C-alpha cells in the first residue's frame, strides 16, 4: 500500500505549475477580451468627429491600465519557472547523498543481523513439542496473517535446523532490502513534499496577486461599462443621422438596381452568343476528329503495305542470292533501286509523324479551350444564382425596414401630440403664475401704502394725545375729578387692546407661510384642514379643473405659489368665536360685533350662486380679505371717486362681482381710530 503513494505524489506533483499557469492565464484572457471589446469599439470611434476623440482617449487610458496590470501581475510566472529549473539542477547531487547514507545503514543492519544469529541456534535446538506451545504458535500465526503462515509452512517442510536458519536468513535479507528501498522512497517523498509545499506557497502568493489583479480588472470593467454607456448614447444620435442617410442610400440603391438589371440583360445576350459559338466550335472539333481518324486508318494501310513490300523484298533477296552468281549486276541495280525507295519511304514516315504531333498539339489546345469555356459558364451561372439570393435577402430587409419606419413615424407623431399638449399646459401655468405675481405686487404696494398711512396716523395720534394731556392737566388743575380719570384710563386700555389685536391680525395676514406642496397621493382631510371648510365644500361640488381656477388655495400640479393659509385661519377663527346672528356670517361682521361696533358698511347676505363658479372669476385672496376687514373695522373714509362703492368682504360678496383692486382702497386720513400708546407700535414695525 505504501508503494503506491509515491506514484500518486509524482503524478500530482507536476500539476500545480499547470494550475498556476492557468491562473496566470485567466487574467490575460480577461484582458484580451477587454482589449477585443475596446478594439471593437475603436472602429466606431474612428468615423466620428472631434467630440468623439475624448472617448477614444479614455479607451487608450484603459488599455494602458490593462498593460500595467499585466506587467505587474502577469510576470509572476517567470520567476517560478526559474526556480523550477534551479531545483532540477540541484536534484542530482541530492540523489547521490542518500546512496552514501544507505551504505552506512546497510553496515549497521548487517551488524544487528549478526548478533541475533547466535541465540537463534540454541533456541532452535531446544524447541518444545508440547500442545500448549503449538496452540500459542497457532494464535500468533493467526495474528501475523498469510505471510507468516506461508513462512511456517515452508519451515515445517524443512527438516534440518540449518536449512531453516538459511531460509530465515534469506527471508530476513529480502525484508531488509525492501525496508531500505522503502526508506529511500520515503526520503524522496519527503523531498517531494517539501517541493510541493514550496510550490503551494508560491501558488498562494500568485493567487493573492491574481485576486488583486481581478479587483483592478473589475474596476476597469466598470469604467468600460460607463464608457460603453456614453458610446451607446452617441450611437443613438448617430442612428438618427444615419436614418436620413439610409433614405438617400435607398434611392441610390434603386438606381443601382436598374443599372444591374440592364447589365444582366446584356450579359444574357452575350451568353446566348457564346453558346452559339460553342456549338459551332464543337461541330468543328467533331469534323477534325473524323479527319484525324481517317488519316490514322490510311497510315495503318500504308504501314501494312510497307510490311508486305519488305517481305517481297526479302523473298527477292533470297532468290537473288540463289541467282547471285548469274545476275550480280541486276542485283546491284535492284538493290540501289530498293535502297532509294526505302529512303524515300523513311522520309515520308518522318513527315507523317511530325504531322501527327502537330495534330495532337492542336487537339490538346482545343480541348483546353473547351474546358475553360465550360468553367466560365459554370462560374457565371453560380454568380447569377448568388446574385438572385442576395436580391431576395435585400428585398426582405427593405420590407422589414419599411415596417420599422412606419412604427417609428407613429411613435414620433404621438410624441409630437404629447409635446403640444405639454406646451399648452405650460402656457396656462405661465399665465397663472403671472397672475399670482401681479397679485403679490399689488399686495406689496398696498402694504407700503398702509405703512405710510400708519406713520401719519401715529403722528396725528401723538399730537392729539399731547393736546388732550394738556387739556386734561388744565381741567384737573381746575376741577380734579378722580372717577373721570379712572374711566378715561379704562377706555384707553380697551382701545389699546383692540388696536393691538387688529395689528396682530394684520401681521398674521401678511405673513407668508411656506407650506409643502400637496401631492395627489396625500389624503383630502389634510388639504381640508389647511385650506378651510369653504374651499373643501367648493371642491367637492365642483369639477377639479374649475376648483383650481376658482380656489387658488388648492394645490396645483405645476407648483405655482399659493396664498398663505394663516389669513384664512384668522378669519375663520373670528367667525367661530362670535355668535352668528344670521346664517351667512362674514369675518368682518364677526370682528365688528366682537368689538361692539355696528356693521353698517357691510352689505346684507346674498345667496350663493354655483353658476358663477364656472365663469372663470377667481375669488379674493385671504390677504385681500383681511385688508377689507381692517377697512370695515376702522371705518376708513373713502375717497370721493369711490363713494359709490361699499367695502365688500370676500366671504359675503356674490361670485358674479369682480374682486376689488388695490386702487379702490383710499389712502387719506381716517376717523374714529382708537388711541394706542407708542409701545405697541415698535413691535409691529
Curated annotation (Swiss-Prot):
Residues 47-67, 80-90, 465-478 have a biased composition (Basic and acidic residues). Residues 575-591 have a biased composition (Low complexity). Keywords: Coiled coil, Phosphoprotein. Specifically expressed in skeletal muscle. Residues 138-354, 381-470 form a coiled coil. One of its GO terms (molecular function) is syntaxin binding. Residues 98-113, 479-495 have a biased composition (Acidic residues). Residues 1-135, 465-497, 517-685 are annotated as: Disordered. The modification Phosphoserine is found at residues 477, 484, 486. InterPro entries: Taxilin_fam. Residues 18-28, 612-627 have a biased composition (Polar residues). It holds the Pfam family Taxilin. The keyword Coiled coil applies. Promotes motor nerve regeneration. May be involved in intracellular vesicle traffic. Belongs to the taxilin family. Binds to the C-terminal coiled coil region of syntaxin family members STX1A, STX3A and STX4A. Has a preference for STX1A. PANTHER family: BETA-TAXILIN, TAXILIN. This is Beta-taxilin. It comes from Mus musculus. The gene is Txlnb.
